[in-house]
C-alpha cells in the first residue's frame, strides 16, 4: 500500500496524547472531501509551499487516482492520537523522513470502501499541510505480545545492545527478520533475529539478502567517483555532454548536483505511474526516462542549489554513467563495485532469482512483491547482505582507496551537524564523524553507519519497512563508544 501515495517529511514519534487539534480536523475533513470528489488540484492547494516544491502535482494526482481506483472513497475518519516529535531521522526510498522542522502531527484511521489506512498529518502555522502519509494500520498489540528469546552465546552484543535490538524488533510482525553487522576497530561480527509465533529469537542470516533501498545511491556515487579518477567525466561536468539528444529547454544538469541532491529535480519523474515499481511487465523503462528528459524535465529554480532529496536525480546519474560505459546496470555495478569488493551475493538486477532473498513484509506481515525500478535502479534496486555490506564498509578504512575517499568528501552543507558527500550523509557526532545512508522500500528498510577514523560501523537490514531501523542504527553506533 506504500506505493499508492507519497510519504513525505515524516518525523519520528516520542510523545503521544489523545487531544485532537480542531484546526487539523478541519484540514483533514477538507482533504477527504476533495479526495472523494476527485479534486486533486484542490488537495494540492492544501499543501505548504515547501511540500509543493518537493512533490510535483502530477505525482500527487497520479498517486491519489491510483488510491481511489484501488480502495475507493473514504467512508469514515476517526482520530487516533496526537504526536510530538523528538528527533530527526534520515531515511530514503520510497519514503523520505527528513525532519527539517520539528512539527507535531496527528493520526487518523481512514476507512475506505475496500480497506482501512492510517493517515498521519502535520500542518504549519498557516494551516497548510507540511507532513502527510498514508500507510497500513499497524497491529498495536505486536509490542505487548513480543517475547524476548534473544541469546548471544558468542558475546557478539552487550546487554545494552540486546535491549536496544529487542526494543526495535518487537514492532516486527511474525516472519520479520533483522540482520546486523558490527564493525569494531576493523573487526566484523554478525548477529541476526527472527520473529516466529511472537517469539523473537537469535537467527543466523548474515548471508541472506534484502533490498537495501537507497544505500544503493552510495554505490552509484562510487561509480561516478571512479569515472572521475579515470578521466571519463569531470566532477562538475554536465550530463548534457554525454547524452545523444537535447535535454528539455537545454537545462544544464551537473553530475555533482545529481549526487548530492541539489539539482532542482523533483523526487520522481512526472511520467512514472504508481504501478510501475511493482509489476515486472510494467516497469519504468529507459525509454520512459528518455522521453521524460527530452519532453518533460523541469528544473525548479527555487530549489536548485539547495538540498531536495531526489530519487530521480541519482537514478538519472546512474543511467548516464551506464550510457558512457555502454553497458547495462548489472555489468556496470558488478565491474566497479560488487566484483571489486568480493560482494558475491549482491546484485542490482532485481529480476534475478535468489534463494538467499528474504521476502519483504508489510507492517502487518503480508508478503510484498519486490521492487522493479528498471531505469531508476541506480536509486534503490540493489539487493545485498550484511556480510557483503560489511566488506564494503571495511574497504572505507583503506586510505589508499581514492574512489572511496572521493565519495566521502563534503560537497554540500545541510546544517551544522549534517553535510553531504557524493552519496554519503556526513554526520557530526560529538568528537566523531560518521558516514551514513539509510534505505526504505516497500517491505524492507536498512541503515549503514561508518566511522572511518575509529574503524567502527553498524549495518542493519530488515525485511519490513519500519521507521525504527534508522533510529536503531544510530543508537547502536553510539553504543560502540
Predicted regions and their residues:
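Bacterial Sec-dependent N-terminal signal peptides
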Residues: 1-23
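Short, low-complexity N-terminal intrinsically disordered segments enriched in polar/charged residues
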Residues: 15-39, 45, 147-156
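Short beta-strand edge/turn micro-motifs at domain boundaries
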Residues: 114-146
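Short, well-ordered beta-strand elements
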Residues: 119-120, 130-134, 437, 446-464
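Short active-site loop at a secondary-structure junction
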Residues: 174-179, 200-257, 299-312, 377-380, ...
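Short, surface-exposed loop or secondary-structure junction motifs
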Residues: 251-442, 446
